[in-house]
Amino acid sequence: GIFLDKLKNFAKGVAQSLLNKASCKLSGQC
């Protein structure tokens, strides 16, 4: 339902920001 979709979008956003943080730390460009 709608709640599940919101949850999925939220999880995607969190995962994306974690990936961005991890990759910027790895490349040393934070």
Swiss-Prot record:
It comes from the Eukaryota. Its main location: secreted. Disulfide bonds join C24-C30. Coiled coil: none annotated. One of its GO terms (cellular component) is extracellular region. It is found in: Secreted. Keywords: Amphibian defense peptide, Antibiotic, Antimicrobial, Cytolysis, Disulfide bond, Hemolysis, Secreted. GO terms for biological process: defense response to bacterium; killing of cells of another organism. Expressed by the skin glands. Shows antibacterial activity against representative Gram-negative and Gram-positive bacterial species, and hemolytic activity. Belongs to the frog skin active peptide (FSAP) family. Brevinin subfamily. This is Brevinin-2Ej. The lineage of its organism: Eukaryota, Metazoa, Chordata, Craniata, Vertebrata.
